[in-house]
Amino acid sequence: MAKKYTKDYRVTDTLNEQGRRERRVDYIGKTYVWHEGDAARKALRFANGICAVGWAAWLLPLLPRSEATQTWYVLPFFLFIALPLGLVSGTLLWLRRSGEVLTHREADQASNRIPGCGLFMTLLPMLSLGGETILYIQQRKLPGRADVLFALGALLLLVCGLLLRRMAPHFRTEIRE
């Protein structure tokens, strides 16, 4: 747990019937709710769909062998898209299980991590597409089918990142009264 959230918890030690020490952790911090309520829940479901499409758009272009997957200034940017995509996917699944009332940590992750990862999911495909464009300008030939699939996957990931950035206002939280 991050040091930032340690004041939100209270640890109590008690003895059980067998004489063993049991440690209990209770959340005592502020609780948060979604600013937009049902609209935020719909946005979470839509964002989960975006992540599913993003994973397909990331994995499918890597399967066939192409010029882009063999070029050092194209492939690393495309591979690193998995980091923000994985962070967003994990955060969304975690938030989906959390219920209506959020802890301080969950509220921070919803408000900060999703838009930040959306930014990187926008920038990294741009860099990958830029590298692929340079590759084909240098080679002076048309790309093959696998390279077109790679470019379409990067474009789809770019759209996924833009959609996540656009949905950022839906993930605002407020302190529960």
Segment roles from a protein language model:
Residues 101-118:
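Short membrane-interface loop/juxtamembrane segments of multi-pass integral membrane proteins
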Residues 45-65, 81-85, 120-133, 156:
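Canonical alpha-helical transmembrane segments of integral membrane proteins
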Residues 63-73, 137-145:
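Helix-coil boundary and interhelical linker segments in multi-pass alpha-helical membrane proteins
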Residues 82-102, 164-169:
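Membrane-water interface of transmembrane alpha-helices
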Residues 69-86, 149-156:
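Alpha-helical transmembrane segments
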